[in-house]
Design a protein with these regions (language model features):
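Structural and coupling elements of P-loop NTPases
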Residues: 1-620
Length: 620
């Protein structure tokens, strides 16, 4: 037997391990759903829900994938393990670890939008791991589809990211995941009602895992899960050897220590289910339970052959904010979990599975510094806690400054904007004011321009709302972390207008709103309960303005209360959680409960606020 034949005998041809990566909303999760439907995995009677791979309510509502999911499909006797990864760079910690578990990637790109910032981010991670790529140009049925140009853009991106010759020779499949069609031709007329071209391309091009099941076990934890019945679960790949239920094994910890434990349960992935199995071999993607304090990057080996794999690198947080117990006048009225103990327990529980998150104590037992990969990362955590019944307050997000080689540095983001040409001047000016550097400007046809900028992350805090207003809602902005660069001195970004602040507690009245709305934009409806120091709108000028929004019209013998019913006021602007976060200034908090999102001044009393401001100015 020659060397080539010997190597061939050591491959597990019955398995392929792939990750599906893409920009947000390019159809990745829909594609996975369709692969599940058309494979031999699901029972014919099984009805698959739309976005079946997205298990989290927020994921389904926003159409984004936050947590990596794993599933497996069977096709012509081959088991294809599929990792569905987040498409947003804020969840890049997940993306990096998944790349360690697979041998190839399916890159999904929109046939019209082409390559986007997050496409760049996830592809860079895949190429760094020397993974074999396949490109699926999705949404080929769009009237505006430009598949040939998009493939050229993908090739340019591969070259720019340093792909080797083998990676540059990627196969391309054209598909419409929502219609369940695909083809090797870029002509939409050639689409076939089958996913077979994608399945066949995966099996033909993605390498089979090496079968070294007879060697000592090596299993590395890439993801974490938690189950009330079995405790903490480590999900990862068996890189070498075999593991069975009941095996006595050693866990090599991140700090260099080791712990012995018994494998109590093993789980394999079948369709959308996680099923108990008795044994797993090299190349399998599995879940292991039995060790309560198992963590991402740690290695499981036999007790008599301890050999840890290199620790997985996890991107550091770039943004932080203060989480506080809710101490507003309305504290405890709407939430189930309101105490510092409950809030801290919930934050610590999040650390069990989210390794890109940091939670640090402060000098107060009611405050914590929470750091993450971006605004989206932290806003998802806040929204999740609010849905679970928690009350809390958070401060304005701020970037994390690092010292690199003795130089203070801050995070910069690569920003890509698609806007009608008529707004490009305003966009360029606004990002230049936020210390952005324009890298590229391309006319994409149909009166559209694509702008690419490098902008300090500080400059993007609160920019989204301004951008949408500037482009009348027609602009599309995507951004992703690029690198740390020397800190730019001075203030960047921030809110240009002051707040309208309630001076009294009570219910907002139509009468008061009518007199106040000429001063700015109102955030509350008539009848909304307010308190002193609560922000009820945005001033049209730079300064904060204290107003009485609870004042009722005095009744006279001539006029009656029914007269007010004909009063017409402007529709208030009700802020979303993200918009509220963007609105915040340094002296303000966002109050979050299961029922409400409120903005408030940190110091509620007007006289005390003015006193603190004078003290601050004299100190400067």
């Amino acid at each position: 037997m020659n060397i080539i034949e010997e190597i061939m005998t050591k491959l597990r041809e019955d398995i392929r391990n792939i990750a599906i990566i893409a920009h947000v909303d390019h159809g990745k999760t829909t594609l996975v759903d369709e692969l599940l439907k058309q494979s031999e995995t699901l029972d014919a009677r099984t009805e698959l829900a739309e976005r079946a791979m997205d298990s989290n309510d927020i994921e389904k509502e926003r159409g984004i994938t936050i947590l990596a999911k794993n599933t497996a499909v069977a096709y012509n006797g081959t088991r294809i393990n599929i990792m569905d990864t987040p498409g947003h760079a804020d969840f890049g910690g997940e993306v990096e670890r998944i790349m360690k578990m697979v041998d190839g990637v399916v890159l999904v790109v929109d046939a019209y939008e082409g390559t986007m910032p997050q496409t760049r981010f996830v592809l860079k991670k895949a190429l760094e791991q020397d993974l074999v790529p396949i490109v699926v140009v999705n949404k080929i049925d769009k009237p505006s589809a430009r598949p040939a140009e998009v493939v050229d853009e993908v090739l340019e991106l591969f070259i720019e990211l340093g792909a080797d010759d083998d990676q540059l020779n990627f196969p391309v499949v054209y598909a419409s995941a929502i219609n369940g069609t695909s083809s090797l031709s870029d002509d939409p007329a050639d689409q076939e009602a089958t996913m077979a071209p994608i399945f066949d391309t995966i099996i033909d091009h993605i390498p089979a895992p090496v079968d070294n099941s007879d060697e000592p076990l090596q299993f590395q934890v890439s993801l974490l899960d938690y189950n009330d019945f079995v405790g903490r679960i480590g999900i990862g790949r068996v890189f070498r050897g075999t593991v069975k239920v009941g095996d006595q094994v050693t866990l090599s910890k991140l700090d260099g220590t080791t712990k012995n434990f018994r494998v109590t349960k093993l789980f394999g992935f079948f369709g959308l289910e996680r099923r108990e199995i008795q044994e797993a071999k090299a190349g399998d993607l599995i879940a292991v339970s039995g060790m309560e304090d198992i963590f991402v990057g740690e290695t499981i080996t036999p007790t008599d052959a301890v050999e840890a794999l290199p620790i997985l690198h996890i991107d550091e947080p770039t943004l932080q904010m203060t989480f506080l117990v809710n101490n507003s006048p309305f504290a405890g009225k709407e939430g189930k979990w309101v105490t510092s103990r409950k809030v801290e327990e919930r934050l610590q529980a999040e650390l069990q599975t989210d390794v890109s998150l940091r939670v640090d104590p402060t000098d107060s037992p009611d405050k914590w510094t929470v750091s993450g990969r971006g605004e989206l990362h932290l806003s998802i955590l806040i929204e999740t806690m609010r849905r679970e019944g928690y009350e809390l307050q958070v401060s304005r997000p701020e970037v994390i400054v690092k010292e690199i080689d003795g130089v203070k540095c801050e995070p910069f983001e690569r920003v890509q904007i698609d806007t009608p040409e008529e707004y490009q001047g305003s966009v360029i000016q606004s990002l230049s004011e936020r210390k952005g550097e324009m890298l590229d400007m391309i006319s994409t046809g149909n009166g559209q321009t694509r702008l690419v900028f490098l902008v300090p992350a500080r400059g993007l805090i609160g920019y989204s709302t301004e951008f949408l207003s500037m482009t009348r809602g027609y602009g599309i902005m995507n951004h992703t972390f690029d690198q740390y660069l020397p800190l730019i001195p001075g203030e960047i970004g921030g809110r240009h207008r002051g707040a309208l602040v309630s001076i009294d507690a009570g219910k907002a009245t139509t009468y008061s709103i009518m007199s106040i709305e000429e001063r700015g934009t109102i955030f509350v409806n008539p009848g909304t309960e307010v308190y002193e120091g609560m922000i009820i709108g945005e001033n049209s000028r730079e300064n904060d303005l204290t107003v009485n929004i609870t004042k009722a019209k005095q009744m006279t013998n001539v006029r009656s209360a029914t007269k007010d019913q004909t009063a017409v006021i402007k529709t208030p602007r009700i802020l979303t959680l993200e918009e509220s976060l963007e609105f915040l200034n340094d002296d303000e908090y966002m109050e979050v409960t299961p029922e409400s999102i409120r903005l408030r001044k940190q110091i509620l009393n007007k006289a005390e606020r003015e006193k603190a401001n004078k003290k601050k100015k004299s100190a400067e």
